[in-house]
Amino acid sequence: MGIDKADVRFVIHFSSSKSLENYYQESGRAGRDSNSADCILMWRFSDLFRLASMVSSERTGIAKLYQMVGYCIDPNKCRRYLISKNLGDTSWSTDDCKNACDNCQRKSTNKSDVSTLIQIKTNELLNATKQLLFDQSLTKQERITGPKLIDLMTCNKQIQSISQKLLNKNQEKPERQFYEHFISWCLIHQYLKLDFHFTPYSTVCYVVNNDNIVDNEHIELMPYLLSNKKEECFHVDAKRKRIHSTEIVDLT
């Protein structure tokens, strides 16, 4: 990014970077004139597997990617603190943020009608997910990609029942976003792991059980931001038809 311009007001990532070092460099293009600027990062579950296939051959590629994913999915800690900690800067504290990041802003405004931060004990859900992966590999001789695993979890009655209890949703079906967050969290904490299959034309990422993790009773609590409002979503069919009703707004 050869941008020699001091008054950049926005840096927008439509996808995650491969590492926090890269993201720090790229977002650092904003606000070099000492005035405030916004850095917006758009993250989705498929980014993890797309980027993992790109960095799988690098010695520290996956470890650095997991740091980046942890930054993206953390709903609680200060964003700047996460960057500083992972880059070895111990001088920065959350108080220095001054509510500049979304997590610090959320805690300062305390809008409980919009979202609630909860800590989830995932032992039972992790066991059910591992059993699902084991059953698929044993009975169907099938390896599961990340998106396919989410599809299976949303259709599995046992996993749905466990998730409803964890989220205190007795009747409402848990959203796909919850399972995506859970699998991402399990991968970066190595409760599950990625298995790569190399072809002449591509690298395919599969999610498999981590046999090195035997004791599921002492896993960390998973922080999750539970939305208290029904989000409005635009859905596109399999042919990815263009939505013509969307109004175009001129920001200039």
Question: What function would you assign to each model-found segment?
Answer:
Residues 1-4, 221-222:
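Short intrinsically disordered, low-complexity coil segments enriched in acidic
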Residues 83, 183-199:
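A short, conserved structural fragment
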Residues 78, 98, 189, 203-204:
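Active-site lining segments that contact anionic ligands and/or coordinate catalytic metals
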Residues 41, 199-209:
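Minor-groove-contacting beta-hairpin "wing" of winged helix-turn-helix DNA-binding domains
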Residues 3-176, 182:
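C-terminal helicase lobe
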Residues 51, 56, 208-238:
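Short, amphipathic alpha-helical interaction segments positioned at domain boundaries
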Residues 242-251:
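Short linear regulatory motifs embedded in intrinsically disordered, acidic Ser/Thr-rich regions
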